Amino acid sequence: NVALAAGAGVRLGSTGAIAVDERMETSVPGVFAAGDCAEALHLVTGRPAYVPLGTTANRMGRVAGACAAGGRDRFRGIAGTSILRVGRLAFAVTGLLAAEARREGFDPASVRIDAMDHVKYFKGRPTSVALVADRRTHRLLGGWVTGEAGVPGRINLIAAALTTRMTVEDFEQLDLAYTPPFSPARDPVQVAANELLKLLD
């Protein structure tokens, strides 16, 4: 609810939420906003976005509190990373899917792969990974992961790649940990990146 803020002269952004700078300060000097009432910079599009998540609110609140107390913290933005569980399956997403990327002016290429989260002799379970990248720059734009195990780590890896503006080539070459009880020799996210590269070359 932003009615109180709007009534007090605080500027609302293009998303309808409260517009803030990287210090979480509103258009009214000395007044800060954070959480579900405030918009944030989207790290992929570079534009304001409204993605009300607990993790985002927590990070925003820490920056707003520090800056209100005279600190110099900065909120760098969001990728919209989220996860949920339905039964035994976890579903996670970060960044832009292909249709969203197209609407934002990118020329997206996307791929989905189905793999095992462990080698078979360690009772590997099915997992699926999708990645989206821009055809011109090869920059990763987003992705999603589903499966029974390992989903949080894989989606967080993709989110980190978005935050650092990695290309698919960079992502595919990451030096990730491997031992049979924990993962396959080629992690499913890198298998997906390798398949995506075939669409970009």
What do the predicted segments below correspond to?
Residues R11-T15, G71-S82, D107-V111:
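A short alpha-helix-loop-beta-strand transition element characteristic
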Residues A57-G65, A69, V189, A193:
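Short, amphipathic alpha-helical "lid/cap" segments that border enzyme active or binding sites
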Residues M24-T26, R76, K123-G124, A133:
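Solvent-exposed alpha-helices and their adjacent loops that cap or buttress functional pockets
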Residues R47-V51, C67-T94, L174-Y178:
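Active-site-proximal substrate-binding core of FAD-dependent oxidoreductases
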Residues N1-V63, L157, A161:
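FAD-site-proximal beta/loop scaffold in flavoenzymes
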Residues F32, A69, V145-T146:
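Residue-level structural signal for beta-strand termini and adjacent loop
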Residues R88-F91, R102-D201:
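Flexible, glycine-rich terminal cap/loop adjacent to redox cofactors
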Residues L96-A98:
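N-terminal glycine-rich dinucleotide-binding loop that anchors FAD/FMN and/or NAD(P) in oxidoreductases
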